[in-house]
């Protein structure tokens, strides 16, 4: 019964906490909009030269551009956003481990609130601007919208689960910046943020579409465009990464106990 109230409260807390940084979010929305316009013109030129590249037409490509720009904040595609490394270094993680919920579930609930806030404040403006300037396609019915909503939620969970593992690494590495940098490169390149993974050739394309990063952007955008669903793929990677995160949490707890925390 406690969990029924606890986790919705934590989601609301995560939303409100990030709402205090409204100007930062609006600045991010402005930046995403500007880069979205620049990317759109590049993609228009590319698709005019190579029509139907990767199974997309020009409108699909421009829609891909602005919807992926809207995903940057909610999916936290440049990494971070959890605050766990700082708490591990300060020792405050010991307090987190005695809360009435697991560290992983607690942090996930807060992150869902963060994602919801950034979707509204940082995600909608570039999408609306793209629709106004270029004209974007959209899901063709309530069923497709519902599938996209579910896929988007699963993408946020996969993103969280990956970033959670990166954050836990500081318990053994002391400084997670190297891992975080590698993670940012992988998320940017293999999620589908830079370019649709459908245009990657041969074995590189097969590899990119099989990695968890594809579940963060490429699968949701394909659902949005009606190019497929991929929900089972997202569920699989969410389950795998969350299981690894749960195992990592147990190792962190053991390490804190051994060190007298």
Which residues does each PLM region occupy?
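Hydrophobic transmembrane alpha-helices and immediately adjacent juxtamembrane helices
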Residues: 1-261
């Amino acid at each position: 019964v406690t969990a029924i109230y606890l986790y919705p409260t934590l989601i609301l807390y995560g939303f409100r906490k990030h709402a205090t940084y409204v100007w930062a979010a609006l600045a991010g929305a402005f930046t995403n909009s500007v880069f979205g316009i620049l990317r759109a013109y590049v993609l228009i030129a590319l698709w005019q030269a190579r029509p139907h590249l990767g199974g997309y037409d020009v409108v699909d490509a421009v829609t891909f551009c602005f919807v992926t720009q809207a995903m940057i904040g909610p999916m936290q595609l440049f990494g971070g956003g959890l605050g766990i490394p700082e708490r591990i270094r300060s020792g405050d993680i010991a307090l987190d481990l005695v809360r009435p919920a697991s560290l992983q579930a607690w942090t996930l609930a807060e992150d869902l609130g963060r994602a919801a806030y950034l979707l509204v404040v940082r995600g909608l403006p570039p999408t609306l601007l793209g629709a106004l300037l270029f004209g974007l396609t959209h899901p063709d019915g309530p069923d497709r919208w519902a599938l996209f909503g579910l896929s988007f939620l699963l993408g946020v969970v996969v993103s969280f689960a990956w970033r959670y593992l990166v954050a836990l690494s500081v318990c053994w590495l002391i400084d997670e910046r190297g891992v975080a940098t590698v993670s940012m490169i992988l998320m940017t390149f293999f999620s589908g943020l830079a370019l649709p993974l459908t245009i990657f050739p041969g074995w590189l394309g097969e590899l990119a579409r099989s990695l968890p990063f594809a579940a963060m952007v490429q699968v949701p955008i394909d659902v949005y465009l009606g190019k497929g669903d991929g929900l089972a793929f997202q569920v699989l990677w969410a389950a795998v990464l969350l299981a690894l995160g749960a195992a990592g949490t147990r190792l962190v707890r053991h390490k804190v106990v051994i060190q007298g925390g």
